Amino acid sequence: MIRTSFKHSIETRNQLLHRRHFVVAAALTVGNFVFGRDARLADAMDNGELHNKNEDYKAKAEELKEQRLRSIANSRPMKPCYEGHVPLYPHERVLLFITSGLKSYFHPEDGENIVQLGEASAFTPFLERLKNTMLSDKTGRRILREQPDITSESLDMDRLKKMAPNTLGHSYYKWLIKEGVSPDTRAPVKYIDDPTHAYIFKRYRQCHDFYHAVNDLPIIIEGEIAVKALEAANIGVPMAALGALLAPLRLKPVQKKRLYDVYLPWAVRTGLSCEPLINVYWEELLEHDVEELRKKLRITPPPDLRAIRRERAQQRKQFKLKYERHE
């Protein structure tokens, strides 16, 4: 009797355990189905794969992106007037002028600072005067009408390489190779509102290397200051005038002496006496004899800055050797 009762108790316990395992397994299965489904739903929602199966999620995302861009555009003082245009409020322009000016002074090696300062200081009266200078000249009017771009492709660098050594094109090509630069490195204009003014400033910026090449001035700091002074005297670029006045303050005494004695007087004299360089259609003069072109533009190149620096370095080297022998 006792044995039968004990046996019955064990069977009952096993049934309960089996039933509990079944319930737990069922609960886990249901939980995995429910919560796992929730996790899958969350992933699907995040991937845009849910809700209306006929809805194009990519199109929706693109629409949201466009809405954000429109909201940013609506926060500007005007709609962009040309590709890449970033309209600024007056206080933003003042802030850009101050910050880019300070950064240009302390970090002149960063071209982005110079680019921003150039546009922040490109005041409307200056650009309007430059436009009138171009409109008063036959070639200047044609440049404004045609609005050419100076790029490696438009100039055809292989063609320049094969030109006669005495041509402007070959001289320009040699200068580019020597200095390790390209016509394509000029930044686009962003912060000037009027499209015509923006093109004029872009044209000035793209012609900058021709001013270097026709005068054989390197892109080292002294050469850049000399070209900036030339641009300030000839074209009246505010940023160029600021650079010519302030940049020499950070130079070594020997560099300052060269600039103040030779290159700045040359730049101011040449800039005031030569033809308006903004009206020169450089692309059409590539096959011209560079010496004849200089005479036509009334430009006399300055002394060779590279040669002067090499001579100075050689003198220092000889002086150092002489000093070491006497020690």
From Swiss-Prot:
Pathway: Cofactor biosynthesis; ubiquinone biosynthesis. GO terms for biological process: ubiquinone biosynthetic process. Keywords: Lyase, Membrane, Metal-binding, Mitochondrion, Mitochondrion inner membrane, Ubiquinone biosynthesis, Zinc. Its EC number is 4.1.1.130. Its cofactor is Zn(2+). The keyword Lyase applies. It is found in: Mitochondrion inner membrane. The keyword Membrane applies. It is an enzyme of class 4 (lyase). Belongs to the COQ4 family. Lyase that catalyzes the C1-decarboxylation of 4-hydroxy-3-methoxy-5-(all-trans-polyprenyl)benzoic acid into 2-methoxy-6-(all-trans-polyprenyl)phenol during ubiquinone biosynthesis. Component of a multi-subunit COQ enzyme complex, composed of at least COQ3, COQ4, COQ5, COQ6, COQ7 and COQ9. HAMAP family: Coq4 (MF_03111). This protein may be expected to contain an N-terminal transit peptide but none has been predicted. This is Ubiquinone biosynthesis protein COQ4, mitochondrial. It comes from Lachancea thermotolerans (strain ATCC 56472 / CBS 6340 / NRRL Y-8284) (Yeast).
